[in-house]
Amino acid sequence: MSRLLLNCDIGESFGNWTLGLDAEVMPFIDCANIACGFHAGDPGIMRKTVALALANGVRIGAHPAYQDLAGFGRRSMSYSPEEIQDLLHYQVGALDGICRAQGGRVEYVKPHGAMYNDMMAKPAQLRAVIQAVAAYDPQLPLMLMATRDNSAAQALGDEYGVTLWFEAFADRAYDNAGHLVSRQLPGAVHHDAQTILQQALTIARGEPLAASDGSALLLHANTLCVHGDNASSVAAVQRIREALNQQSGL
């Protein structure tokens, strides 16, 4: 990727319950991480979200999770490597089928919530996720968190021939190791649109952020995430899009 891509977790409503402002966000993003039914989403929501992404020319990514609808996929759970691969294949395959029925396709994979965090904390789980992507389609990139040092993850991706897209967050606070501050702690999520915009621009320029302890943190990222369930992020997303386009000369 030659420029920083803007991605958003999206399609996270289900049944009569609505979350996020998908239609408002979609025109300004490059990549839509669409929930696949295990933490949020359902077949109808998936179909509608795919149609919205295709209408806006947005790349579609599968956003698989632990099977935890009640906990929104944010609770860590114990799975074997084989079970992790089963979860991924089931969810990616479901979204891919819905995409193909509308003339689209899944273009990358980004795990959600606790699956994402556990993947970053446990090398064996990261290996299982990369193996699952490679087995399903080795041409699909895997989106994962950019940290102070991406080299270990990159080596695993290279081992299985899977492209890695390293992701930074515009609306989350970081600790000094380059990990996201737990949502259980105060200040973990930025709720001011100007703060979100400034963090996005800092990352896009390749400049160091201020970690939660005040230390400088430099992240090497390919893509930037904003959350569609954070009203402040939605308020900032158009300004972020305009700033990224200006930086890229678009």
From Swiss-Prot:
CDD domains on file: LamB_YcsF_like
Keyword Hydrolase: yes
Keywords on record: ATP-binding, Hydrolase, Nucleotide-binding
Record-level GO BP terms: carbohydrate metabolic process
Membrane-spanning ranges: none
Pfam families xref list: LamB_YcsF
GO molecular function: 5-oxoprolinase (ATP-hydrolyzing) activity; ATP binding
Catalyzed chemical reaction(s): 5-oxo-L-proline + ATP + 2 H2O = L-glutamate + ADP + phosphate + H(+)
EC number(s) on file: 3.5.2.9
Family: Belongs to the LamB/PxpA family.
Record text on subunit structure and interactions: Forms a complex composed of PxpA, PxpB and PxpC.
Function noted in UniProt: Catalyzes the cleavage of 5-oxoproline to form L-glutamate coupled to the hydrolysis of ATP to ADP and inorganic phosphate.
UniProt-recorded name of the protein: 5-oxoprolinase subunit A
